[in-house]
Amino acid sequence: MSQLSSTLKRYTESSRYTDAPYAKSGYGTYTPSSYGANLAASFLEKEKLGFKPVSPTSFLPRPRTYGPSSILDCDRGRPLLRSDITGGSKRSESQTRGNERPSGSGLNGGSGFPYGVTSNSLSYLPMNARDQGVTLGQKKSNSQSDLARDFSSLRTSDSYRTSDGYRASDGFRIDPGNLGRSPMLARTRKELCALQGLYQAASRSEYLTDYLENYGRKGSAPQVLTQAPPSRVPEVLSPTYRPSGRYTLWEKNKGQASGPSRSTSPGRDTMNSKSAQGLAGLRNLGNTCFMNSILQCLSNTRELRDYCLQRLYMRDLGHTSSAHTALMEEFAKLIQTIWTSSPNDVVSPSEFKTQIQRYAPRFVGYNQQDAQEFLRFLLDGLHNEVNRVAARPKPSPESLDHLPDEEKGRQMWRKYLEREDSRIGDLFVGQLKSSLTCTDCGYCSTVFDPFWDLSLPIAKRGYPEVTLMDCMRLFTKEDVLDGDEKPTCCRCRARKRCIKKFSVQRFPKILVLHLKRFSESRIRTSKLTTFVNFPLRDLDLREFASENTNHAVYNLYAVSNHSGTTMGGHYTAYCRSPVTGEWHTFNDSSVTPMSSSQVRTSDAYLLFYELASPPSRM
């Protein structure tokens, strides 16, 4: 595996410095390789390499997971770009710098799901907390080792009866009327075993029914290879297990027609309702806390929330040439349900999960995943479905080298919008300037790349505490490319020592900063727990701008947190309400108020900043 920096890969693996752009006079020409293809290459960089498939000749350790696996279990790391996602569009993914990661993955999380949770509820109908059964915290406390022994001793039987009750493997009988009871309510081990067997049997039946209804139609074929039955639960509790579920596991929507149910649009005024506070929790479907954390952060993104609540996305769905709009529709319905539910309600995102795993099959099943990867796939899918460009124009071989950098960046942005123009992009996409200067002749070449987020290395200076500005300065600092890293200068016509540097040409409305919590060890990947001190208000990034600007001040409104290790852990979210301005902790189905002084922790992984309103002119 090459140990060249990821930034170098973006420079040297494209044809900019070896073929047309840097080695010849056409550097900066807008072609797929100079403005688009290299962006795909930046996403192919293994900043968070996936765990390699286990084979008899592989000595790489297989990651632990605390939930059921699927056939895609080996594909756990940073995903490769799929042609069905990017299509003709080759936009940048996250912009990052740093050495390639050794074998490992991102910060996988999702083990903190309630015991016995399944994903068979196919609607966004919220469940009131008053009817949600008993939590572990309400029962007599037991040590984790005792719980682990009790849960690991459970056994289930594949045989069950539908008329006279369920007969477990040890002969203990339970009436079907107890179907709504959670295994947590069992009074004896026999009853616990029988209830668990009943749940698994019912889940297998419902999973098969759901699969046939979705994929069994004549002439249709499943878009996914396989899916693990959602009823499977960990045999031993994860070290990061958190009892966050407080709902009746098998509560069904009565009176609904057969087939996959879909949530109806909210019928009351979402903006005037006192209960519309966006404080509904999300059910953990089984290792899906990474998804819940990101969804809550996006739900509290003011302009994206309004885009869904006011149904503005409907006018953009007709512009796309693709007939696939289910992901945007389900995402909007989920946001609408969250904001029309009462506080402490719990919403099941099962239909949304069905759509995201159809768009990105790597999320099929119930493996722990990296939240930043999920965010990138989700934003890419939403953007594609509401892209205002019906037919993308062919790239023109127009040379922009003769233009000043400011005008060149403006023209590059215009060409980008000719192909990629959506409300999602309006909010999250910025523009990064990359410069490469030859130390011999002084020739400087520039290229402008769109970005959806910035992956920041964690600075070592000031350990054990660094500031977010330290990380930004490390991201934008000058790097010397020498030795084997030398690119070819088109003016010198030889490989020369060069200096590369990043700066922000265009700041997005929503700036997502990804803290790269990965160690530099070549033996194995471990998580960095360094505390990064980040501001909640007035994050001034003007010193990182390519040109003078007074509009680069941000305020924090959401944080996605990861606790645990790179092998497994749990995700939560801290979000500031766009309505009340108050902070809340979103831990799957649990939503609790918090103080702004509690937002900064060493578990912060993704920071969501919104551009502050420009000062009014007198």
UniProtKB/Swiss-Prot annotation:
Biased composition (Basic and acidic residues): 90-100
Annotated Polar residues bias: 255-274
Stored InterPro entries: Papain-like_cys_pep_sf, Peptidase_C19_UCH, Ub_carboxyl-term_hydrolase, USP_CS, USP_dom
Induction section of the entry: Up-regulated by IL-1. Isoform 1 is up-regulated with any signal for withdrawal from the cell cycle such as serum deprivation.
Regulation: Cleavage is inhibited by ubiquitin in a dosage-dependent manner. Cleavage is blocked by ubiquitin aldehyde.
Entry keywords, A to Z: Biological rhythms, Cell cycle, Cytoplasm, Hydrolase, Membrane, Metal-binding, Myogenesis, Nucleus, Protease, Thiol protease, Ubl conjugation pathway, Zinc
Gene3D superfamilies according to UniProt: Cysteine proteinases
Residue numbers annotated as active site: 289, 570
A Pfam family of this chain: UCH
Region annotation (Disordered) ranges: 54-112, 246-274
Organism superkingdom: Eukaryota
GO biological process: circadian behavior; circadian regulation of gene expression; entrainment of circadian clock by photoperiod; locomotor rhythm; muscle organ development; negative regulation of skeletal muscle tissue development; negative regulation of transcription by RNA polymerase II; positive regulation of mitotic cell cycle
Enzyme Commission identifier(s): 3.4.19.12
GO MF term (any one): cysteine-type deubiquitinase activity
CC per GO annotation: centrosome; cytoplasm; membrane; nucleus; perinuclear region of cytoplasm
Domain USP, first and last residues per copy: 280-612
Domain writeup: The different N-terminus extensions of isoform 1 and isoform 2 determine their respective subcellular localization and differential effect on myoblast fusion and accumulation of muscle-specific proteins. The different N-terminus extensions of isoform 1 and isoform 2 are not essential for their catalytic activity.
Subunit organization: Homooligomer. Found in trimeric complex with MDM2 and MDM4 and USP2. Interacts with CCND1; the interaction is direct and promotes its stabilization by antagonizing ubiquitin-dependent degradation. Interacts (via N-terminus and C-terminus) with MDM2. Interacts with MDM4. Interacts with PER1. Interacts with KCNQ1; counteracts the NEDD4L-specific down-regulation of I(Ks) and restores plasma membrane localization of KCNQ1. Isoform 4: Interacts with NHERF4 and CLTC.
Role description: Hydrolase that deubiquitinates polyubiquitinated target proteins such as MDM2, MDM4 and CCND1. Isoform 1 and isoform 2 possess both ubiquitin-specific peptidase and isopeptidase activities. Deubiquitinates MDM2 without reversing MDM2-mediated p53/TP53 ubiquitination and thus indirectly promotes p53/TP53 degradation and limits p53 activity. Has no deubiquitinase activity against p53/TP53. Prevents MDM2-mediated degradation of MDM4. Plays a role in the G1/S cell-cycle progression in normal and cancer cells.
Family the entry assigns: Belongs to the peptidase C19 family. USP2 subfamily.
Official protein name in the record: Ubiquitin carboxyl-terminal hydrolase 2
Annotated source species: Rattus norvegicus
